[in-house]
């Protein structure tokens, strides 16, 4: 869709087709205010020109960097349990979150990953529904949620929280092929779940 920024009429037609359906989800599922076409069009008019200079063939850009001996860093979000192939279906995202897919998605499918850093928060979070074996409730959960700022960026909905789950973490390390682990923060130093 990024290339459609160069064809505003095509982009606007596509967005108009999607807008009604997406607004139903925004309002019905997330309880947020739906967007108006004026809001979308204003955003397009101000943002498209700022974004256009950064649109390129990322595969060619990365191949050039690799050929020139530059280091390439891929970053991802979401955990292994949200991966389309290795996660807990149907609570997965629509794509692959596993490190091995990063080069493929970038256009540099021949890349050799020589270092995979698994980043683990000192507590667990979950967005949306699905199994969450170590979920905390009540006052303790509220304190953790507040300390970590665990609220949806768009909706402000509170995220589900709990102590770090080492079983899920071990699974993530295995399917990611992590070569090292970094544990972030100290909010839940006393609570570790080994289910």
State what each model feature region is.
Residues 1-195:
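Non-transmembrane, aqueous-exposed alpha-helical and coiled segments at domain scale
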């Amino acid at each position: 869709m990024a290339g459609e920024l160069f064809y505003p009429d095509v982009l606007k037609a596509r967005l108009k087709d999607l807008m009604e359906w997406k607004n139903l989800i925004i309002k019905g599922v997330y309880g947020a205010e739906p967007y108006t076409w004026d809001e979308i069009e204003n955003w397009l008019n101000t943002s498209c020109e700022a974004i256009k200079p950064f649109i390129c063939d990322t595969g060619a850009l990365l191949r050039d960097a690799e050929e020139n001996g530059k280091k390439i860093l891929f970053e991802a979000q979401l955990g292994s349990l949200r991966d389309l192939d290795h996660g807990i279906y149907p609570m997965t995202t629509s794509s692959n979150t596993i490190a091995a897919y990063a080069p493929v998605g970038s256009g540099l499918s021949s890349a050799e990953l020589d270092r995979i850093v698994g980043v683990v928060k000192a507590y667990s979070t979950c967005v949306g529904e699905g199994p969450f074996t170590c979920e905390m409730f009540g006052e303790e959960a509220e304190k953790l949620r507040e300390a970590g700022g665990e609220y949806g960026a768009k909706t402000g909905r509170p995220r589900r929280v709990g102590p770090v789950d080492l079983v899920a973490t071990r699974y993530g390390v295995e399917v990611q092929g992590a070569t090292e682990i970094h544990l972030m923060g100290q909010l839940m130093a006393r609570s570790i779940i080994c289910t």
